[in-house]
């Protein structure tokens, strides 16, 4: 419970979860929390008071804002507390490589990235390539994207496996983030939002 609001999170053992699913199988739609509060039987439901920060991510804009908050060291320290480690799937990739002449500042750059251009105030997932002469600013670039030479990405979220061709400009604004799904682009394209 956060400020007397449910965080809509619950922990249920597998056996109980399967019983709930079987019991409500005929319902067109039923939220797990609704089932726990419903007439399923006598389930012992307890709450846990969480005193840390809770943020909801319900839109592309909130995803962008909350992700970019991680660039603030205070926020990152709260989330990545060594006393509460976050365990994720390990990938066997080399560390990120920064070429001579590249520039990266105030960014989270995951393993396996190759940085030859400029990255500022951005979050790069595993395996992103930023070629020489390319720039990424205030953006979230997901797994295995390639930002080709001369391309410019600003205030954007790119889905994984996108290739931003040479001399392409993708630019949103802080209030109107550009979101690029899996979409092939051609060289010299400009998308401004």
Language-model features, listed with the residues they occupy:
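Short, small-residue-biased leader/transition segments that mark boundaries at the very start
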Residues: 1-2
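Conserved nucleotide-sugar donor-binding
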Residues: 8-20
């Amino acid at each position: 419970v956060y400020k007397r609001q449910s965080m809509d999170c619950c922990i249920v053992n597998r056996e109980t979860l399967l019983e709930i699913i079987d019991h409500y199988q005929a319902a067109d739609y039923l939220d797990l929390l609704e089932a726990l509060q419903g007439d399923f039987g006598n389930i012992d439901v307890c709450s846990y008071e969480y005193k840390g920060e809770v943020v909801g991510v319900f839109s592309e804009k909130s995803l962008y804002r909350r992700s970019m908050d991680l660039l603030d060291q205070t926020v990152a320290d709260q989330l990545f507390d060594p006393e509460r480690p976050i365990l994720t799937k390990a990938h066997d990739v080399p560390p990120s490589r920064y070429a001579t002449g590249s520039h990266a500042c105030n960014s989270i750059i995951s393993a396996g990235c190759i940085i030859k251009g400029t990255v500022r105030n951005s979050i790069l997932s595993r395996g992103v390539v930023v070629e020489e002469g390319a720039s990424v600013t205030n953006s979230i670039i997901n797994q295995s994207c390639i930002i080709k030479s001369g391309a410019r990405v600003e205030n954007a979220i790119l889905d994984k496996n996108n290739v931003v061709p040479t001399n392409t400009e993708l630019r949103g604004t802080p209030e109107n983030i550009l979101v690029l799904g899996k979409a092939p682009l051609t060289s010299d394209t400009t998308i401004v939002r």
